């Protein structure tokens, strides 16, 4: 794995490296510092050389690539004909709510949540029913469905807690959803980054799961391709496929042709890079968790993702940890308040070199 020097990372000029002053070390937004997958760089260079800048073609190669990757990694792959390219995961979630749930029905949102999950009910004109993501209590979910909720936003693996859900749990969850004719809208963007065991594809666990789940994923986190604008949505029953095909192109369009090439490439050729990334991230996770616990921070060590949820309650910075760490320690973590009002919490991104991680932890320790 190649780790770019700090100046190289700054020269990327991405959001992570431009939002805050240069003396602030960014360990916040879900963007990796790793060098790019070599096969991906080659594919992008080839596309630029061939001047592939026009309208994107049908994504048939991507469909097969995603299905093959899912089958190899998870033991279940969708029908390639049920896979469709979309600009990004959040667009897919919004479309799923608007076109595949009961009109006007409430949305179950487990908290803490990836901030766009909290915004989605607002922008789709729906009521939100909040539940505790630490518990993901099935009785609480069933009550919400019984009270009229039409869908659950199911981030599996979970962001920011890093929870990986079992087949048994998903089976029970989707059975409950089927009972109330509700939908499970599944965000699997972090699925490639499971540390122990195997990710369970929710749509593949049962017939009820196939009928209730709408699945959205992308290569954005595992291969750092967020700026290339190509996610994937796939369906696991014919009725949903038909409904999707009936949507206007205006509703679905916006995929980047370079994003299509990138996603197809890494699904087909990027597993060696992925495996190497996972080992580095696992080591970083264990190191960061041990060091932060020594400082009195409550650590939720993730089973997946390179994002670590931290609770600073009981420390001297509990009132505004992200703000204080940025101002006094010159290190930036995501503010827990944005994830549903968790004001004593923050989210740390450890997808970086050990040197960078050690420096970030040193800055945190200097404040605590």
From Swiss-Prot:
GO terms for molecular function: cysteine-S-conjugate beta-lyase activity; pyridoxal phosphate binding. GO terms for biological process: methionine biosynthetic process. Its EC number is 4.4.1.13. Disruption phenotype: Cells lacking this gene show methionine prototrophy, suggesting that additional methionine biosynthetic pathway can be present in C.glutamicum. The mutant strains also completely lose their ability to show resistance to the S-(beta-aminoethyl)-cysteine, which is a toxic lysine analog. Its cofactor is pyridoxal 5'-phosphate. Keywords: Amino-acid biosynthesis, Lyase, Methionine biosynthesis, Pyridoxal phosphate. This is Cystathionine beta-lyase. Catalyzes the transformation of cystathionine to homocysteine. Belongs to the class-II pyridoxal-phosphate-dependent aminotransferase family. MalY/PatB cystathionine beta-lyase subfamily. It comes from the Bacteria. The modification N6-(pyridoxal phosphate)lysine is found at residue 221. It catalyses: L,L-cystathionine + H2O = L-homocysteine + pyruvate + NH4(+); an S-substituted L-cysteine + H2O = a thiol + pyruvate + NH4(+). Pathway: Amino-acid biosynthesis; L-methionine biosynthesis via de novo pathway; L-homocysteine from L-cystathionine: step 1/1. Disulfide bonds: none annotated. It is an enzyme of class 4 (lyase).
